[in-house]
Amino acid sequence: MAESTTLETIEIHPITFPPEVLARISPELSLQRHLSLGIRPCLRKYEEFRDVAIENNTLSRYADAGNIDTKNNILGSNVLKSGKTIVITSITGGIIEETSAAIKDLDDFGEEELFEVTKEEDIIANYASVYPVVEVERGRVGACTDEEMTISQKLHDSILHSRILPKKALKVKAGVRSANEDGTFSVLYPDELEDDTLNETNLKMKRKWSYVLYAKIVVLSRTGPVFDLCWNSLMYALQSVKLPRAFIDERASDLRMTIRTRGRSATIRETYEIICDQTKSVPLMINAKNIAFASNYGIVELDPECQLQNSDNSEEEEVDIDMDKLNTVLIADLDTEAEETSIHSTISILAAPSGNYKQLTLVGGGAKITPEMIKRSLLLSRVRADDLSTRFNI
Protein backbone atom coordinates (compact mmCIF):
# COMPACT_ATOMS: atom_id res chain seq x y z
CA MET A 1 0.00 0.00 0.00
CA ALA A 2 1.56 3.22 -1.14
CA GLU A 3 2.06 5.85 1.47
CA SER A 4 0.50 9.21 0.72
CA THR A 5 2.95 12.08 0.46
CA THR A 6 2.13 15.71 1.01
CA LEU A 7 3.91 18.47 -0.88
CA GLU A 8 4.63 21.62 1.07
CA THR A 9 4.44 24.91 -0.75
CA ILE A 10 7.40 27.23 -0.21
CA GLU A 11 6.81 30.90 -0.66
CA ILE A 12 9.74 33.16 -1.52
CA HIS A 13 9.49 36.79 -0.53
CA PRO A 14 11.84 39.46 -1.85
CA ILE A 15 14.21 40.92 0.70
CA THR A 16 14.50 44.66 0.92
CA PHE A 17 17.63 46.22 2.39
CA PRO A 18 17.95 49.75 3.76
CA PRO A 19 20.33 51.97 1.76
CA GLU A 20 23.13 51.77 4.34
CA VAL A 21 22.93 47.95 4.43
CA LEU A 22 22.89 47.69 0.62
CA ALA A 23 25.96 49.94 0.49
CA ARG A 24 27.77 47.43 2.70
CA ILE A 25 26.65 44.32 0.82
CA SER A 26 27.07 45.67 -2.70
CA PRO A 27 28.59 49.16 -2.74
CA GLU A 28 28.85 49.27 -6.53
CA LEU A 29 25.17 48.42 -7.01
CA SER A 30 24.19 51.01 -4.42
CA LEU A 31 26.27 53.65 -6.18
CA GLN A 32 24.85 52.85 -9.62
CA ARG A 33 21.28 52.89 -8.31
CA HIS A 34 21.77 56.37 -6.86
CA LEU A 35 23.59 57.72 -9.92
CA SER A 36 20.77 56.53 -12.18
CA LEU A 37 18.49 58.91 -10.26
CA GLY A 38 20.89 61.83 -10.71
CA ILE A 39 22.08 61.88 -7.10
CA ARG A 40 24.84 60.24 -5.05
CA PRO A 41 24.59 57.98 -1.99
CA CYS A 42 25.29 61.05 0.17
CA LEU A 43 22.32 62.80 -1.57
CA ARG A 44 24.57 65.42 -3.18
CA LYS A 45 24.75 66.29 -6.87
CA TYR A 46 27.59 65.06 -9.06
CA GLU A 47 29.77 68.19 -8.77
CA GLU A 48 28.61 69.34 -5.34
CA PHE A 49 31.14 69.67 -2.51
CA ARG A 50 30.56 69.17 1.18
CA ASP A 51 30.25 72.25 3.33
CA VAL A 52 33.34 73.01 5.42
CA ALA A 53 33.39 74.60 8.88
CA ILE A 54 36.67 75.53 10.56
CA GLU A 55 37.93 76.79 13.91
CA ASN A 56 41.41 78.29 13.86
CA ASN A 57 43.91 78.51 16.70
CA THR A 58 41.49 77.46 19.45
CA LEU A 59 43.88 74.84 20.85
CA SER A 60 47.07 76.92 20.70
CA ARG A 61 48.92 78.44 23.64
CA TYR A 62 48.36 81.79 21.91
CA ALA A 63 44.59 81.33 21.53
CA ASP A 64 43.98 84.05 24.12
CA ALA A 65 46.28 86.96 23.32
CA GLY A 66 45.88 88.46 26.77
CA ASN A 67 46.50 85.25 28.68
CA ILE A 68 49.16 82.91 27.25
CA ASP A 69 48.95 79.32 28.45
CA THR A 70 52.59 78.58 29.27
CA LYS A 71 51.85 74.89 29.92
CA ASN A 72 50.51 74.38 26.40
CA ASN A 73 53.10 73.50 23.74
CA ILE A 74 50.81 73.81 20.70
CA LEU A 75 51.96 76.63 18.41
CA GLY A 76 49.07 76.53 15.94
CA SER A 77 45.91 74.50 15.49
CA ASN A 78 42.85 73.96 13.36
CA VAL A 79 39.62 72.00 13.65
CA LEU A 80 37.98 71.25 10.31
CA LYS A 81 34.57 69.63 9.85
CA SER A 82 33.49 68.42 6.43
CA GLY A 83 30.22 66.52 6.43
CA LYS A 84 30.46 64.00 9.26
CA THR A 85 34.27 63.90 9.25
CA ILE A 86 36.25 65.98 11.76
CA VAL A 87 39.99 66.66 11.38
CA ILE A 88 41.96 68.09 14.32
CA THR A 89 45.43 69.44 13.52
CA SER A 90 47.86 70.62 16.19
CA ILE A 91 51.36 71.89 15.38
CA THR A 92 54.20 71.72 17.87
CA GLY A 93 57.83 72.61 17.44
CA GLY A 94 61.39 72.25 18.57
CA ILE A 95 64.79 73.86 18.07
CA ILE A 96 67.69 72.05 16.44
CA GLU A 97 71.26 73.14 15.86
CA GLU A 98 72.58 73.34 12.34
CA THR A 99 75.48 70.90 12.32
CA SER A 100 77.16 72.43 9.28
CA ALA A 101 77.07 76.08 8.33
CA ALA A 102 75.41 76.91 5.05
CA ILE A 103 77.64 78.25 2.32
CA LYS A 104 75.84 81.58 2.33
CA ASP A 105 76.51 82.00 6.06
CA LEU A 106 80.29 81.79 5.70
CA ASP A 107 82.43 84.91 5.78
CA ASP A 108 84.89 83.74 3.14
CA PHE A 109 84.35 85.60 -0.13
CA GLY A 110 85.34 82.60 -2.22
CA GLU A 111 82.72 80.40 -0.59
CA GLU A 112 80.12 83.13 -1.02
CA GLU A 113 80.99 83.37 -4.70
CA LEU A 114 80.68 79.62 -5.03
CA PHE A 115 77.24 79.79 -3.50
CA GLU A 116 76.15 82.38 -6.07
CA VAL A 117 77.27 80.08 -8.86
CA THR A 118 75.54 76.97 -7.54
CA LYS A 119 72.42 78.43 -5.90
CA GLU A 120 70.27 77.77 -8.97
CA GLU A 121 71.26 74.12 -8.92
CA ASP A 122 68.82 73.08 -6.25
CA ILE A 123 66.13 75.63 -5.39
CA ILE A 124 64.16 73.14 -3.34
CA ALA A 125 67.01 73.07 -0.79
CA ASN A 126 65.95 76.55 0.31
CA TYR A 127 62.63 75.23 1.59
CA ALA A 128 61.63 73.10 4.55
CA SER A 129 58.63 70.97 5.39
CA VAL A 130 56.53 69.83 8.32
CA TYR A 131 56.79 66.37 9.87
CA PRO A 132 53.18 65.18 10.11
CA VAL A 133 51.71 62.15 11.85
CA VAL A 134 48.20 61.16 10.70
CA GLU A 135 45.95 59.10 12.96
CA VAL A 136 42.63 57.82 11.62
CA GLU A 137 40.59 56.81 14.66
CA ARG A 138 38.73 53.54 14.20
CA GLY A 139 38.06 52.55 17.80
CA ARG A 140 41.12 50.35 18.12
CA VAL A 141 44.70 50.55 19.24
CA GLY A 142 47.84 49.31 17.55
CA ALA A 143 50.51 50.30 15.10
CA CYS A 144 49.79 52.87 12.40
CA THR A 145 48.31 51.53 9.18
CA ASP A 146 49.76 51.74 5.68
CA GLU A 147 47.20 54.39 4.77
CA GLU A 148 48.24 56.62 7.67
CA MET A 149 51.94 56.32 6.83
CA THR A 150 51.31 56.96 3.12
CA ILE A 151 49.24 60.08 3.80
CA SER A 152 51.83 61.40 6.28
CA GLN A 153 54.66 60.98 3.76
CA LYS A 154 52.59 62.53 0.98
CA LEU A 155 51.79 65.56 3.14
CA HIS A 156 55.48 66.04 3.94
CA ASP A 157 56.58 65.81 0.30
CA SER A 158 53.75 68.01 -1.00
CA ILE A 159 54.56 70.84 1.43
CA LEU A 160 58.24 70.68 0.52
CA HIS A 161 57.72 70.78 -3.24
CA SER A 162 54.96 73.41 -3.01
CA ARG A 163 57.60 75.80 -1.59
CA ILE A 164 55.32 76.99 1.17
CA LEU A 165 57.80 77.06 4.05
CA PRO A 166 61.16 78.76 3.33
CA LYS A 167 64.07 77.77 5.54
CA LYS A 168 64.86 81.38 6.38
CA ALA A 169 61.45 81.63 8.08
CA LEU A 170 62.60 78.93 10.52
CA LYS A 171 65.91 80.59 11.42
CA VAL A 172 66.21 81.30 15.14
CA LYS A 173 67.25 84.89 15.82
CA ALA A 174 68.52 84.19 19.31
CA GLY A 175 68.66 86.99 21.84
CA VAL A 176 70.88 87.40 24.90
CA ARG A 177 69.57 87.61 28.45
CA SER A 178 71.61 89.89 30.69
CA ALA A 179 71.37 90.97 34.32
CA ASN A 180 70.68 94.61 35.08
CA GLU A 181 72.15 96.63 37.95
CA ASP A 182 68.96 96.30 39.99
CA GLY A 183 69.07 92.51 39.78
CA THR A 184 66.38 92.14 37.09
CA PHE A 185 66.91 90.41 33.76
CA SER A 186 66.33 91.77 30.28
CA VAL A 187 66.54 90.09 26.90
CA LEU A 188 67.93 91.79 23.81
CA TYR A 189 66.98 90.43 20.39
CA PRO A 190 68.91 91.23 17.19
CA ASP A 191 65.93 92.63 15.29
CA GLU A 192 64.89 94.85 18.21
CA LEU A 193 68.19 96.78 18.46
CA GLU A 194 68.45 100.13 16.71
CA ASP A 195 72.26 100.25 16.85
CA ASP A 196 73.57 97.87 14.18
CA THR A 197 77.12 98.09 15.57
CA LEU A 198 75.97 96.85 18.97
CA ASN A 199 73.96 94.16 17.24
CA GLU A 200 76.92 92.79 15.29
CA THR A 201 79.34 93.06 18.23
CA ASN A 202 77.34 91.52 21.04
CA LEU A 203 74.78 89.24 19.40
CA LYS A 204 76.65 87.68 16.50
CA MET A 205 77.23 83.97 17.15
CA LYS A 206 78.91 81.28 15.13
CA ARG A 207 76.32 78.69 16.14
CA LYS A 208 73.07 78.57 14.18
CA TRP A 209 69.70 77.17 15.20
CA SER A 210 66.46 76.49 13.37
CA TYR A 211 62.89 75.71 14.33
CA VAL A 212 61.43 72.37 13.29
CA LEU A 213 57.66 71.85 13.09
CA TYR A 214 55.67 68.71 13.86
CA ALA A 215 51.99 68.23 13.02
CA LYS A 216 49.64 65.73 14.64
CA ILE A 217 46.50 65.20 12.56
CA VAL A 218 43.63 63.21 14.07
CA VAL A 219 40.74 62.13 11.82
CA LEU A 220 37.40 61.31 13.47
CA SER A 221 34.34 59.72 11.83
CA ARG A 222 36.06 58.91 8.56
CA THR A 223 33.58 58.49 5.70
CA GLY A 224 35.81 58.77 2.62
CA PRO A 225 39.28 59.75 1.37
CA VAL A 226 41.04 61.89 3.97
CA PHE A 227 44.14 63.30 2.26
CA ASP A 228 42.41 66.44 1.01
CA LEU A 229 40.84 67.09 4.43
CA CYS A 230 44.19 66.60 6.20
CA TRP A 231 45.94 68.90 3.74
CA ASN A 232 43.35 71.68 4.03
CA SER A 233 43.38 71.51 7.82
CA LEU A 234 47.19 71.63 7.81
CA MET A 235 47.14 74.71 5.56
CA TYR A 236 44.84 76.52 7.98
CA ALA A 237 46.95 75.48 10.97
CA LEU A 238 50.22 76.65 9.38
CA GLN A 239 48.79 80.12 8.82
CA SER A 240 48.06 80.44 12.54
CA VAL A 241 51.47 79.28 13.83
CA LYS A 242 53.43 81.58 16.13
CA LEU A 243 57.04 80.73 16.97
CA PRO A 244 58.30 81.50 20.49
CA ARG A 245 61.33 83.74 20.68
CA ALA A 246 64.54 82.13 21.94
CA PHE A 247 67.54 83.49 23.82
CA ILE A 248 70.70 82.40 25.62
CA ASP A 249 72.04 83.52 28.97
CA GLU A 250 74.82 86.09 28.84
CA ARG A 251 76.77 84.20 31.49
CA ALA A 252 76.77 81.08 29.33
CA SER A 253 77.75 82.78 26.07
CA ASP A 254 81.49 82.50 26.79
CA LEU A 255 81.50 78.93 28.04
CA ARG A 256 83.71 76.40 26.29
CA MET A 257 83.45 72.64 26.32
CA THR A 258 86.43 70.31 25.80
CA ILE A 259 85.82 67.39 23.47
CA ARG A 260 88.40 64.61 23.45
CA THR A 261 88.92 62.30 20.50
CA ARG A 262 90.35 58.86 21.34
CA GLY A 263 92.06 60.34 24.39
CA ARG A 264 94.78 62.09 22.38
CA SER A 265 93.55 65.30 20.80
CA ALA A 266 91.11 67.87 22.14
CA THR A 267 88.99 70.54 20.53
CA ILE A 268 87.30 73.53 22.12
CA ARG A 269 83.65 74.05 21.30
CA GLU A 270 81.18 76.71 22.36
CA THR A 271 78.28 75.48 24.42
CA TYR A 272 74.96 77.27 24.83
CA GLU A 273 71.70 76.60 26.59
CA ILE A 274 68.99 78.05 24.40
CA ILE A 275 65.76 78.99 26.19
CA CYS A 276 62.35 79.81 24.75
CA ASP A 277 60.61 82.99 25.85
CA GLN A 278 57.35 82.26 27.67
CA THR A 279 55.54 85.36 26.43
CA LYS A 280 57.11 86.73 23.24
CA SER A 281 56.47 85.15 19.86
CA VAL A 282 56.70 85.92 16.16
CA PRO A 283 54.32 84.77 13.40
CA LEU A 284 55.54 82.11 11.01
CA MET A 285 56.37 83.82 7.71
CA ILE A 286 55.21 81.46 4.97
CA ASN A 287 54.76 82.03 1.24
CA ALA A 288 51.09 82.99 1.21
CA LYS A 289 50.99 82.96 -2.59
CA ASN A 290 51.90 79.25 -2.57
CA ILE A 291 49.13 78.24 -0.16
CA ALA A 292 47.01 75.68 -2.00
CA PHE A 293 43.91 73.68 -1.15
CA ALA A 294 43.17 70.09 -2.07
CA SER A 295 40.18 68.56 -3.80
CA ASN A 296 39.51 65.11 -5.21
CA TYR A 297 37.34 63.75 -8.00
CA GLY A 298 36.19 60.39 -9.27
CA ILE A 299 35.20 59.20 -12.73
CA VAL A 300 32.57 56.49 -13.00
CA GLU A 301 30.68 54.91 -15.89
CA LEU A 302 26.92 54.52 -15.54
CA ASP A 303 25.86 50.91 -15.91
CA PRO A 304 22.49 50.63 -17.75
CA GLU A 305 21.78 47.23 -16.16
CA CYS A 306 21.81 48.76 -12.68
CA GLN A 307 19.39 51.56 -13.45
CA LEU A 308 16.08 51.65 -11.65
CA GLN A 309 13.29 50.98 -14.12
CA ASN A 310 9.61 51.84 -14.05
CA SER A 311 7.57 48.68 -13.52
CA ASP A 312 4.79 49.91 -15.84
CA ASN A 313 7.07 50.35 -18.85
CA SER A 314 9.79 47.87 -17.97
CA GLU A 315 9.60 46.01 -21.27
CA GLU A 316 9.88 49.16 -23.39
CA GLU A 317 12.79 50.49 -21.34
CA GLU A 318 14.66 47.19 -21.60
CA VAL A 319 14.53 47.47 -25.37
CA ASP A 320 15.92 51.03 -25.30
CA ILE A 321 19.04 50.11 -23.28
CA ASP A 322 22.20 50.39 -25.38
CA MET A 323 25.02 48.41 -23.77
CA ASP A 324 27.62 49.88 -26.13
CA LYS A 325 26.98 53.40 -24.86
CA LEU A 326 28.21 54.05 -21.33
CA ASN A 327 27.81 57.54 -19.96
CA THR A 328 30.75 58.76 -17.88
CA VAL A 329 30.22 61.27 -15.08
CA LEU A 330 32.58 63.30 -12.89
CA ILE A 331 32.05 63.01 -9.14
CA ALA A 332 33.46 65.79 -6.92
CA ASP A 333 34.55 65.37 -3.29
CA LEU A 334 34.24 61.60 -2.85
CA ASP A 335 32.35 60.53 0.25
CA THR A 336 30.73 57.41 1.73
CA GLU A 337 32.06 53.88 1.54
CA ALA A 338 30.17 53.13 -1.69
CA GLU A 339 31.99 55.88 -3.61
CA GLU A 340 35.41 55.20 -2.12
CA THR A 341 35.40 51.46 -2.80
CA SER A 342 33.63 51.51 -6.19
CA ILE A 343 35.31 54.45 -7.95
CA HIS A 344 38.82 53.50 -9.05
CA SER A 345 39.61 56.31 -11.51
CA THR A 346 40.41 59.39 -9.44
CA ILE A 347 41.90 62.87 -9.82
CA SER A 348 43.57 64.72 -6.94
CA ILE A 349 44.50 68.39 -7.32
CA LEU A 350 46.27 71.00 -5.18
CA ALA A 351 45.17 74.42 -6.45
CA ALA A 352 45.97 77.92 -5.22
CA PRO A 353 43.36 80.72 -5.22
CA SER A 354 45.61 82.67 -7.60
CA GLY A 355 45.08 80.02 -10.27
CA ASN A 356 48.38 78.17 -9.90
CA TYR A 357 48.34 74.40 -9.52
CA LYS A 358 50.83 72.73 -7.20
CA GLN A 359 50.02 69.07 -7.77
CA LEU A 360 47.96 66.89 -10.09
CA THR A 361 47.58 63.16 -9.49
CA LEU A 362 45.73 60.88 -11.91
CA VAL A 363 44.89 57.29 -11.03
CA GLY A 364 43.27 55.18 -13.72
CA GLY A 365 41.72 51.92 -12.73
CA GLY A 366 38.22 51.91 -14.11
CA ALA A 367 36.52 54.52 -16.25
CA LYS A 368 38.50 56.37 -18.90
CA ILE A 369 39.81 59.80 -17.85
CA THR A 370 39.20 62.14 -20.77
CA PRO A 371 40.80 65.58 -21.36
CA GLU A 372 37.38 67.17 -20.82
CA MET A 373 37.19 65.57 -17.37
CA ILE A 374 40.62 66.92 -16.46
CA LYS A 375 39.75 70.44 -17.64
CA ARG A 376 36.50 70.37 -15.68
CA SER A 377 38.22 69.16 -12.51
CA LEU A 378 40.89 71.87 -12.81
CA LEU A 379 38.20 74.53 -13.09
CA LEU A 380 36.27 73.18 -10.11
CA SER A 381 39.48 72.98 -8.06
CA ARG A 382 40.23 76.63 -8.63
CA VAL A 383 36.72 77.65 -7.57
CA ARG A 384 36.95 75.39 -4.53
CA ALA A 385 40.34 76.82 -3.52
CA ASP A 386 39.03 80.36 -3.81
CA ASP A 387 36.09 79.48 -1.57
CA LEU A 388 38.23 77.75 1.09
CA SER A 389 40.73 80.62 1.19
CA THR A 390 38.01 83.05 2.28
CA ARG A 391 37.13 80.91 5.31
CA PHE A 392 40.43 81.53 7.09
CA ASN A 393 39.98 84.05 9.85
CA ILE A 394 42.21 84.08 12.91
UniProtKB/Swiss-Prot annotation:
Function, in words: Non-catalytic component of the RNA exosome complex which has 3'->5' exoribonuclease activity and participates in a multitude of cellular RNA processing and degradation events. In the nucleus, the RNA exosome complex is involved in proper maturation of stable RNA species such as rRNA, snRNA and snoRNA, in the elimination of RNA processing by-products and non-coding 'pervasive' transcripts, such as antisense RNA species and cryptic unstable transcripts (CUTs), and of mRNAs with processing defects, thereby limiting or excluding their export to the cytoplasm.
Record-level GO cellular component terms: cytoplasm; cytoplasmic exosome (RNase complex); exosome (RNase complex); nuclear exosome (RNase complex); nucleolus; nucleoplasm; nucleus
Cysteine disulfide links: none
Protein name per the record: Exosome complex component RRP43
Effect of V212A: Interaction with RRP46 abolished
Gene that this sequence comes from: RRP43
Residues the record lists as Phosphoserine modifications: S26
Organism: Saccharomyces cerevisiae (strain ATCC 204508 / S288c)
Record flagged with keyword Phosphoprotein: yes
Main location, first listed in the record: cytoplasm
Residues bearing the modification N-acetylalanine: A2
Pfam families: RNase_PH (PF01138)
Gene3D superfamilies reported for this sequence: GHMP Kinase, N-terminal domain
Misc remark: Present with 3180 molecules/cell in log phase SD medium.
Keyword set includes Disulfide bond: no
Keywords of the record: Acetylation, Cytoplasm, Exosome, Nucleus, Phosphoprotein, RNA-binding, rRNA processing
Taxonomy, superkingdom: Eukaryota
GO MF, any single term: mRNA 3'-UTR AU-rich region binding
Subcellular location field: Cytoplasm; Nucleus, Nucleolus
Any GO BP annotation: nuclear mRNA surveillance
